[in-house]
Amino acid sequence: MVHGWDGNPKNAWFPWLKKELEKNGFVVFTPLMPKPEEPKIDKWVNYLKEDVGVPDKDTYFVGHSIGCQTILRYLERVETPVGGCVFVAGFFNLPNLETEEEKEIAKPWLSLPIDFEKVKRCTNKIVAIFSDDDPDVPIEDKELFEKHLNAKTIVEHNKGHFSDDAGITELPSALNTLLDISK
């Protein structure tokens, strides 16, 4: 499970999902990504590579926000088949960044292309979960996940950015999706 920008593995619904997955027999890794307040593609992808080791068809990924981007960029580099991915508040656009610093940090994540064909060769089980009132991720990105990744998409209501600020401490849709795609 890969947390988001300025996040950590103890944020929001991460502890709950980890516990629920472990109850269902999953071995769950929730690394604290390097310098979460200033995520860099190469640092995060390389860190994930070290943490995961050699993935296989029984490896599943869950990402939140920029953690989704990290997983996509990881998969395009390793090109190894995995079980599937659940992306929560994943994005390709961030139109509401407020500061120049935020825009500078986000720029490479938004401008460097992802090889979607390589990602799709790794798995055909991709589910992306969005909220209809996310202040950061435009709901239109749902269509981009469907188009570029053949992702199944779920739209939750009133979940904001699925963060502590939105008060989201449990996320049954992520759990149920992961249990479903891992059958």
PLM feature segments, named:
Residues 4, 33-36, 86-96:
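Active-site nucleophile loop of the alpha/beta-hydrolase fold
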Residues 100-118:
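Active-site nucleophile elbow and catalytic-triad environment of alpha/beta-hydrolase enzymes
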Residues 122-123, 127-130, 134:
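Short beta-strand/loop motif that positions the catalytic acidic residue
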Residues 135-141:
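Conserved alpha/beta-hydrolase "acid-adjacent" motif
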Residues 60, 83-86:
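Residue in the alpha/beta-hydrolase core beta-strand immediately N-terminal to the catalytic nucleophile
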Residues 1-57:
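Active-site catalytic motif of lipid deacylating hydrolases and related acyltransferases
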